[in-house]
Amino acid sequence: LPAKKKTDQTYSSVLSSGEFHKISIPEDGVYKINSAFLSASGIDISAIDLSKFEIYGNGGGMLPEIILKERPEDLTENRIYVYDENSNNRMDANDYILWYAKGPTTYNYLNLFESYEAIGHDFDVASYYFITWEGAAGKRISSLPSGEQLTPNVTVAQYDHLIYHESNEENHIKSGRRWWGDKMQIDRQKTF
């Protein structure tokens, strides 16, 4: 057996102090947090300091089952774009935060078959991110100065879009991690 990885660090999670709110993410994409979303979630938006707004999460997929494989020690702070219309660092009606989040499904490219394999999460239908506005200034996606433009060196005219459908509704033995899609009855017609 390989030697156990030695660590001299004392582990302390970023979630160990402060107030955090959990957000579920069903699929990969750019997500928007605005005052309406936060208010509907029961959060007092008057307490939010946009300069300190942070989002933590490690994206989709399951942690490795093999104990010796690399895995994150803690949640990673994600870079975010903050639109603060009047630059007052308060969450006003037109202000919002954007960031790219990964859902629970991961994809591997299989060279032999020249296709992708979707790997669903065995235990959940969402991945989770945590938001806070109590710490230091959060990481941001940098913007170009006004009027400055980048010249693209590649123009994309087409791309492959992956669509993955797996409902995981049937477990024949009512136990374990083996799930199947929709139960097929005598009627062979199925509309998706």
What is the predicted role of each segment?
Residues 27, 32-40:
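A short glycine/threonine-centered beta-strand motif
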Residues 1-26, 41-192:
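Structured catalytic cores of large enzymes
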